[in-house]
Amino acid sequence: MKKDIIICNTYFQLIEAIQLKNTLFLHESVTVVFSDHSRNAENIIKQIKSLDIFEQCFFWSSFKKMKEQEKNSHENRRLLLCEITGKDGYGNPFESEFYDELIYYNQFDNLKVVFAELYEKNPQIKISRFEEGIFSYADGEYLAKKDKIVNPLRKILGKKTLLECQQNFYCFYPELYKGHLNPMQIPKIEADGKTAQILSRLFDTSTAVYPQKYVFFSSVFDFEGGAPVGELEVIKKVAALVGNENLIV
């Protein structure tokens, strides 16, 4: 049986992982990893385990580890070496297993460490990305400064890089994807389908707790750095039309 591991940093990615398990990966063994980049992730993983959705579920203190690394030059050097050799990573249980495919979206350094370790277990591992909203359809491949050190050294050692192993891009609207990966359509979530039923058990879906009539789902660019896309001005205009008291962001 094919074994997949899906790394999730946001709730949107987690919902995609659930839908993938219920559709394209229905007859495959799927491990899901949910990180502390999202609040309450540890509790959600406990609930997911109780619902028996995936073969394995793990909580990963990824964000916490990243913050610790920023203050520890020795740890940074150690993990840089791990990106090159694939040895001695974070010590998570999922890092020591064999997988046929790794699916992710956020290309953080810690993801590259996990990739390097999984590659050692299976040099034929397939790497895929999945979408994080429409903006992600136009995502280019970002090469960090460390990649200019890591990638050539991996090639000298006869090891492929993360980008060289990439194949698929899982998304809801493949016709909109213009990147270099192979677009694979995730079936849309049906209102009365299995994924919707799971989500209603995982989360409180009652609308009674929200007095606002409209919800604005923002991206990260305007409030977490990167290139602003002007969302703040858009929100102001929407609020002027519908009223501040009717809008939750």
Mark where each language-model region is.
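Catalytic donor nucleotide-activated moiety binding site of glycosyltransferases and closely related
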Residues: 240-249
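A nucleotide-sugar donor-handling region in carbohydrate enzymes
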Residues: 132, 137-224
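Histidine/cysteine-enriched polar flanking segments
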Residues: 152, 234-237
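Short boundary motifs at domain starts and secondary-structure transition points
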Residues: 21-23, 91-95, 200-210, 238-239
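A short, charged/proline- and glycine-enriched loop
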Residues: 1-4, 97-99, 205-215, 219-220, ...
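A conditional alpha-helix N-cap/helix-loop micro-motif detector
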Residues: 74-77, 81-84, 192, 196, ...
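Short, glycine-rich nucleotide/cofactor-binding loops
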Residues: 4-14, 222-232
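Active-site and donor-binding regions of nucleotide-sugar-utilizing enzymes
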Residues: 5-171
